[in-house]
């Protein structure tokens, strides 16, 4: 089982192990995406983010 979360009315995370809430909303994974040092496309991703001003200042 993986740790999942959903947001409450105040925007705080509510953690659960279920894939769906009682209101039939899909929960989100609480784990970050995997990182690979062998990422072949990181240069292209950074170039696109710079082009469209998506990088933090």
Curated annotation (Swiss-Prot):
Signal peptide: none annotated. InterPro entries: H/ACA_rnp_Nop10 (IPR007264), H/ACA_rnp_Nop10_sf (IPR036756). The keyword Methyltransferase does not apply. GO terms for molecular function: snoRNA binding; telomerase RNA binding. It holds the Pfam family Nop10p. GO terms for biological process: positive regulation of telomerase RNA localization to Cajal body; rRNA pseudouridine synthesis; snRNA pseudouridine synthesis. Gene3D superfamilies: 4.10.80.300. Belongs to the NOP10 family. Non-catalytic component of the H/ACA small nucleolar ribonucleoprotein (H/ACA snoRNP), which catalyzes pseudouridylation of rRNA and is required for ribosome biogenesis. This involves the isomerization of uridine such that the ribose is subsequently attached to C5, instead of the normal N1. Pseudouridine ('psi') residues may serve to stabilize the conformation of rRNAs. The H/ACA snoRNP complex also mediates pseudouridylation of other types of RNAs. The H/ACA snoRNP complex mediates pseudouridylation at position 93 in U2 snRNA. Component of the small nucleolar ribonucleoprotein particles containing H/ACA-type snoRNAs (H/ACA snoRNPs). PANTHER family: H_ACA RIBONUCLEOPROTEIN COMPLEX SUBUNIT 3 (PTHR13305:SF0), RIBOSOME BIOGENESIS PROTEIN NOP10 (PTHR13305). This is H/ACA ribonucleoprotein complex subunit NOP10. It comes from Kluyveromyces lactis (strain ATCC 8585 / CBS 2359 / DSM 70799 / NBRC 1267 / NRRL Y-1140 / WM37) (Yeast).
């Amino acid at each position: 089982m993986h740790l999942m979360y959903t947001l409450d009315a105040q925007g705080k995370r509510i953690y659960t192990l279920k894939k769906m809430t009682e209101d039939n909303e899909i929960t989100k994974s609480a784990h970050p995406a995997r990182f690979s040092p062998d990422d072949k496309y990181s240069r292209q991703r950074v170039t696109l983010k710079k082009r469209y001003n998506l990088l933090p200042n």
